[in-house]
Every structure is written in structure tokens, then in C-alpha cells.
A protein has these predicted regions:
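C-terminal substrate-binding/active-site "lid" region of AdoMet-derived donor-dependent transferases
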Residues: 143-199
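Conserved S-adenosyl-L-methionine
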Residues: 76-83, 147-149
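A contiguous loop/helix-start segment that scaffolds small-molecule binding in enzyme catalytic cores
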Residues: 1-36, 183
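S-adenosyl-L-methionine
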Residues: 86-125
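Short beta->alpha hinge that forms the Motif I/post-I loop of the SAM-binding pocket
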Residues: 87-92, 132-133, 158
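Conserved alpha-helix/loop element of class I SAM-dependent methyltransferases that forms part
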Residues: 39-56
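Conserved SAM-binding loop of SAM-dependent methyltransferases across substrates and taxa
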Residues: 67-79
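Conserved class I S-adenosyl-L-methionine
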Residues: 57-66
Length: 200
């Protein structure tokens, strides 16, 4: 018969040379759909996720999801990890959706909304990564503490003012393990016959 006839058909598609699945952690920045939204760079992503010490059954909030690069990396660690990427800007939320689809991640949920208001509608988290707080860091930490007083939280800060504010805010809570780490990353780039280290 022909394929124009009605009936049940079965089709097998084989890829003779599939791309090998990476066994390493860490995706290159170029792997992500970027747009004009700021993105946490590769080396900082890996350190931040390492400091979170996620477990296979973790539930994690990524507050200020941006492009979704951190959310994607966390979700790829295990199918059992549930990641909620929270983003209030529509352009950024759309990028997270596109990156979620690109990497086929069913365990990554994009939450369009502002933290901390939308956090109480989500399943309680065991971990939280704060890449951007929109100026609401004290309120966000208050809600996180109420949701789970033993939640492990990693906060990225670019300015000295934000870093100082974080240590000031943390004094309000009985923090079991407080750690402040300064990370500087430079990448070599060609300038004529020379290579210059450029800050990331």
C-alpha cells in the first residue's frame, strides 16, 4: 500500500552518528541561547553550583534566572532534581524556556514572577541560588528562611556594596555555615602577536 492510505504506521528513525553525551559537568557559554540578557559565566556557574552541594532529590529555586544557564546546569545533574527558575522579566523568562527546550529538561520549571511573592506558591526548596534579587534581598531571605530554615543558599554578588549587604543581612539568622568567596576569572585573548588576560 501507499502512505496515503488510512491506517496505523510505524516509523523507525536511526541516527548513524549521534553526538556523544557529555559525562563532564559544565557547558560552554556558547551552548546557551543568549539574547541580550546577562548570563552567569561558565566558571562562576560551576563554582556556584558546587557550593550548593545539591543532592539527587533536591528541590532548588534559581532566583533571577536570567538566561537559565544556572538552572539548566543544575537540572542536568539529575532527573530527580527539581529546579524552579524564577524570573520577572518576560524576555529573560522566554530565554529560559528556549534553553529548557534546547536541553530537553522536564525537571526545570520556569516561574514568571517576582521573588519573594511567588515563592510561597512553589514546593518547599532544599536549596536556593540567588543570581539577582532586584533589590529585594532581605525580603527574599526572610521568605526562604520561613520556607525551610535549613535551606542551603548561594548568593552571587558583583558589587562590594551587595557583598557588604549580604553579610549584614545574614547576621539576622542562625547561619550554620557562612562562607564568603571572591572569585576572579580572566581569559586569554589575542592582541596582535601577544596574548592578553581579559577579565570575565
Amino acid at each position: 500500500g501507499s502512505l496515503t492510505e488510512e491506517g496505523l504506521y510505524t516509523c523507525l528513525v536511526r541516527n548513524p552518528s549521534p553526538m556523544p553525551e557529555s559525562a563532564s559537568c559544565g557547558l560552554p557559554d556558547e551552548s546557551f541561547i543568549r539574547g541580550s540578557v546577562p548570563m552567569t559565566k561558565e566558571e562562576i556557574r560551576e563554582i556556584s553550583i558546587c557550593k550548593l552541594r545539591l543532592q539527587k532529590n533536591s528541590t532548588v529555586y534559581d532566583i533571577g534566572g536570567g538566561t537559565g544557564s544556572v538552572s539548566v546546569e543544575m537540572a542536568r545533574l539529575s532527573d530527580e532534581i527539581q529546579v524552579f527558575s524564577i524570573e520577572q522579566k518576560e524576555e529573560a523568562a522566554e530565554l529560559i524556556e528556549r534553553n529548557r527546550e534546547k536541553f530537553l529538561l522536564d525537571n526545570l520549571t520556569v516561574v514568571r514572577g517576582r521573588a519573594p511573592e511567588c515563592l510561597t506558591e512553589l514546593p518547599p526548596a532544599t536549596h536556593a541560588f540567588i543570581g539577582g534579587s532586584g533589590g529585594g534581598l532581605p525580603e527574599i531571605l526572610d521568605v526562604l528562611y520561613r520556607i525551610n530554615s535549613r535551606m542551603r543558599v548561594v548568593i552571587n554578588a558583583v558589587t562590594l556594596e551587595t557583598a557588604g549587604r549580604i553579610t549584614e543581612i545574614l547576621n539576622r539568622y542562625p547561619v550554620e555555615e557562612e562562607e564568603v568567596v571572591q572569585v576572579q576569572v580572566s581569559r586569554a585573548g589575542k592582541a596582535g602577536a601577544y596574548h592578553l588576560m581579559r577579565a570575565e
